[in-house]
């Protein structure tokens, strides 16, 4: 008996934060616009509209750099409470078509419409109808990807942006995957991509035609995952309830810092108290698995360190801080963050019985 073919849609709002600002303020519609932090406060760009992207402005770019590329760029502060409200409105539109919704962020989600009856059960028509509803009711545009597996649905949603959609039918999966650059696979970052290129891998087809054991030897678990993706395999389900996995706080400094004492003062007085508050909201019994520190140096290199610990402890961050600063090599520090990985809910419930 053949396995049932799934119908997965990935919906991705077009430059979401900036689009909301342009919708709510008509004066913003024909100018280069970004949502982000102030350049004097070492801010970064959260998102920008397509006019700004013509000049090379991108998300996560320092605001100062964005203004160098586009001097007439208007940078406005974010209104997160508004974006959350709009995200709930988008979610309500999704729920007209399916209950199998996996939000990835405020502006994107996976939908499983395999058993949906709307639009005669056509995933293509459902995606089109959802996008029309969003445009007509909310004044925003969305792009969508339709495929039988999750990672390809996400890839497809980027193929006809903005305000478009792209379908990868089951019989075309391997053909599309073969020609897919490895950087298009979700989860392949800059460092991983560089290592893959050094090993001679550029397309999924290169991975598909390689030796599986050699991939494992060179790239470990990522090698195994890439091998599956390159063969058009992605068994992941659309997860309706996404359990929160981590809690974190961070601070970008208006002036770089450099010493252990400066870092510890920020941790003790600012970051740790805020982390405690957030952990209390996310996990009242404060059950965790790991705690860690993140540092971004002045050259924008990011490094993290963590260790296993069942409870949040301020003193444990001292050793982590000493260890992570061994990687400093004379560089100043631009950003400092703390995080904890939460214990899975089921595991926490089981432990509470004893």
From Swiss-Prot:
GO cellular component: cytosol
GO molecular function terms attached to this record: damaged DNA binding; DNA-directed DNA polymerase activity; magnesium ion binding
Site location (Substrate discrimination): 17
Binding-site positions, Mg(2+): 12, 107
Catalytic center residues: 108
Enzyme superclass (EC): transferase
Entry keywords, A to Z: Cytoplasm, DNA damage, DNA repair, DNA replication, DNA-binding, DNA-directed DNA polymerase, Magnesium, Metal-binding, Mutator protein, Nucleotidyltransferase, Transferase
Residue ranges of every copy of the UmuC domain listed in the record: 8-189
Similarity-based family: Belongs to the DNA polymerase type-Y family.
Function: Poorly processive, error-prone DNA polymerase involved in untargeted mutagenesis. Copies undamaged DNA at stalled replication forks, which arise in vivo from mismatched or misaligned primer ends. These misaligned primers can be extended by PolIV. Exhibits no 3'-5' exonuclease (proofreading) activity. May be involved in translesional synthesis, in conjunction with the beta clamp from PolIII.
NCBIfam families with a match to the protein in the record: PRK02406.1
Protein name per UniProt: DNA polymerase IV
Lineage: Bacteria, Pseudomonadati, Pseudomonadota, Gammaproteobacteria, Vibrionales
């Amino acid at each position: 008996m053949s396995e049932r073919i799934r119908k997965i849609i990935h919906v991705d709002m077009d430059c979401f934060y900036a689009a909301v600002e342009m919708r709510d303020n008509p004066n913003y519609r024909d100018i280069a616009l970004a949502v982000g932090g102030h350049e004097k406060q070492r801010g970064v760009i959260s998102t920008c509209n397509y006019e700004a992207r013509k000049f090379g402005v991108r998300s996560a770019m320092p605001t100062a750099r964005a203004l160098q590329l586009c001097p007439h760029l208007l940078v406005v502060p974010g209104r997160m409470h508004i974006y959350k409200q709009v995200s709930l409105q988008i979610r309500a539109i999704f729920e007209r078509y399916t209950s199998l919704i996996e939000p990835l962020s405020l502006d994107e989600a996976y939908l499983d419409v395999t058993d949906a009856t709307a639009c005669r059960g056509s995933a293509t028509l459902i995606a089109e109808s959802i996008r029309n509803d969003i445009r007509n009711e909310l004044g925003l545009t969305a792009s969508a990807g339709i495929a039988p597996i999750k990672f390809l649905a996400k890839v497809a949603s980027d193929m006809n942006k903005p305000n478009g959609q792209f379908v990868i039918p089951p019989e075309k999966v391997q053909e599309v995957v073969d020609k897919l650059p490895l950087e298009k696979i979700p989860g392949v970052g800059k460092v991983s991509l560089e290592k893959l290129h050094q090993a001679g891998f550029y397309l999924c087809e290169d991975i598909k035609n390689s030796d599986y054991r050699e991939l494992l030897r060179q790239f470990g678990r990522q090698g195994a995952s890439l091998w599956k993706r390159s063969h058009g395999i992605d068994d992941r389900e659309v997860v309706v309830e996404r359990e929160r996995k981590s809690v974190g706080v961070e601070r970008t400094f208006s002036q770089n810092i450099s010493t252990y004492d400066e870092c510890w003062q920020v941790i003790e007085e600012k970051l740790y108290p805020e982390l405690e508050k957030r952990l209390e909201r996310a996990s009242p019994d404060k059950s965790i698995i790991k705690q860690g520190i993140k540092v971004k140096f002045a050259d924008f290199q990011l490094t993290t360190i963590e260790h296993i610990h069942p409870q949040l402890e301020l003193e444990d961050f001292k050793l982590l801080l000493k260890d992570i600063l061994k990687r400093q090599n004379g560089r100043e520090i631009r950003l400092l963050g703390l995080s904890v990985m939460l214990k899975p809910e089921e595991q926490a419930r089981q432990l509470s019985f004893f």
